[in-house]
Amino acid sequence: VASLIANNGKNKTADWAKGFVSNMARKPKGNDRAQILAIAAGEADYAVANTYYIALMLSGKKGAEQQAAAKKVMPFFPNQQDRGAHMNISGAGMLKHAPNKDNAVKLIEFLLTKQAQEHIVNNTFEYPMIDGVSPNPLVPGVDLSFKQDLKTSVKSYGAKQADAIEVMKLAGWK
C-alpha cells in the first residue's frame, strides 16, 4: 500500500483500498498458503500471496493437497503495462559498530555467490539477487512476461508506512 501511495497518491490509493476491501470474499484469515487454498476451493476469485508460496506448494513439500490446490491457481502481476509489480525485498546489512565486521562482509559476499543464490532460489523459491542465476522453474511468472517495479524507491515504503496504515484502517482492512 505504501508503494501505491508513493506512485498514485494517498487519495487515489484510499479509493482503491475501499474498493479492494469491499470486494473481499471473506474476512482475511490465515497465511499466504491459506489464501491460495481458498481460491482453489472456490471461496474467492483472487487473493494476495507471495509467489514463493505458490512454488513451495507446487513442489509438493507441503503435501499433495496443497500441491493440487496450487495447480488450480494462476498468478496475476499488476501494473505490467505501467511501472511493473511491487516485489518484496530481502537484504543483508552490517551494523556500524559490529564486532566482527570482516566476518559480516564475508557472509554477505558469500550470500551473493552463484552457489548460495542457487541454494536460496531452490529452497525458498525466492527470486535470485544476482545475474546468472535463474529462478526455480516452479516460481510463477518465470514463464510469463513479468515486469518488476524498478521505479519506486524502497525508501518510499518506510516514508509512506504511516499513511499506508491509515489508508488501510479507514478502508476497513483487517
Task: Enumerate the predicted regions with their spans.
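Ligand-binding pocket segment of bilobal, Venus flytrap-like solute-binding proteins
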Residues: 2-78
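Structured segments of extracytoplasmic/periplasmic soluble domains
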Residues: 7, 23, 38, 42, ...
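Soluble non-cytosolic domains of exported or imported proteins
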Residues: 11, 30-33, 48, 97-102, ...
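Solvent-exposed, polar/charged alpha-helical surfaces in well-ordered, non-transmembrane soluble domains
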Residues: 18, 37, 41, 102-109, ...
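Solvent-exposed loop/turn segments at secondary-structure junctions
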Residues: 52-55, 80-83, 99, 114-117
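Flexible, solvent-exposed loop/hinge segments that line or gate ligand/substrate-binding clefts
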Residues: 68-99
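Mature extracytoplasmic/periplasmic domains
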Residues: 90-149
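Extracellular/periplasmic bilobal clamshell ligand-binding domains
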Residues: 135-174
